[in-house]
Amino acid sequence: MVGGGAGSFIGPVHRMAAELDREIEMVAGAFRRDPAKYLAAGAAWGLPPERSYADWREMIAAEAARPDGAQFIAITTPNHLHLPIAREALAAGLHVLCDKPATATLAEAVELRDCVKASGRLYGLTHTYTGYPMVREAREIVRRGDLGALRKVVVEYSQGWLAEPIERSGDHKQATWRADPAEQGEGGCIGDIGVHSFNIVEFVSGLQVSRVCADLSSVVPGRRLDDDCNVLLRFDGGARGVLIASQIAAGDRNGLRLRVYGEKGGLDWSHEQPDRLTINWLKAPTQ
C-alpha cells in the first residue's frame, strides 16, 4: 500500500476490505510522507522493517524484484500522486488498485489509460457504493426493462463537513489537501464526491453521459476549489439527468441518493438506508 498511514481516512478501509475474505495479505507499504516515520507506520500495520519503505519508488522497485514480492499495490494517497505511482507500478509489472479519482486531470486520465493498455496489467478504481446489494438490484431492475425506457436520473450527494474553512485551521489533514489544487487537482467537491455520483448514475442506469452543463462554485470565501456543484446531464438515447454534489450542505453527513425514472415507474435508493430500495410504480402499489 502507498499512503494510508496515521491520520488517513481511506487507508484503514482498504486494509479491512482486503482482509474480509482472507485471500489478500498486506506485505509491504510506504505509508508516510515523512521518511523519519515510515518504520513506525509499518510496525503499526504489523510489517517487518525490511518491507516498510521510506519512498514509494523504492517500494515498487524492491517488491517487483523480490520472488515473494507484492502482486499489486493499493494507492491511497492524495490525488496528485495517483498517476505517477500507478504509472511506475504498471511499468514494473504490478497490478494497481487505486482510490478515486483515477487522476487529477483529464490529460492524466488519458495518459493512465495508455499506460494500462501498454502494461497488460489490471487496474481497478474503488467506487465503493456500487458494491451495495440494493444498488446492484437497482441496476438489474433497470436492465430487465421493468421501468420501461428511462427518462430521467437524479443523483444527489450532500455533505456538510466543509461548510466552514477548516482547511485553514492547520490541524485537519483531510480538509487541507482536499482544498489544495496542487494535491487535490482541478476539481474540489466534483472531484471528491461528484465522481461517486457520476459513477453510480452510469452504473445503475446503464446509460452514458454525453453532454453536461455544470455550475461549479466556491461558496466558502477564499476557498480555491469548488465546494458546491450543480450539473445538468444529457444521456445517450435522450434521457435527462441532474447531478448535485455539495460539501457545504451544513448538517448533512454523507447523503448520497439516487432516483431513476422510466415510463412505468421510478426507483429510489439512499446511502443513509442502504439496505432499502423503493420502487414507485405508475399503475401499481409501491414496493
Which role does the model predict for each range below?
Residues F31, A74-I75, C98, V155:
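Redox-cofactor binding/interface segments in oxidoreductases and associated redox assembly factors
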Residues A28, F72, K152:
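Short, Asp-centered acidic motifs that coordinate Mg2+ and/or phosphate
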Residues R51-A70:
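A structured beta-alpha segment of the ubiquitous adenosine-cofactor-binding alpha/beta core
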Residues F72, P78-G131, G145:
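Beta-strand-loop-alpha-helix segment that lines the small-molecule cofactor/substrate pocket
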Residues E164, K173, D192, H196-P285:
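Contiguous beta-strand/loop segments that form the cofactor/metal-binding neighborhood of enzyme cores
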Residues I24, E50, Q71, L94, ...:
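Short, well-ordered coil/turn segments that N-cap beta-strands
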Residues M1-L47:
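N-terminal Rossmann-like dinucleotide-binding module
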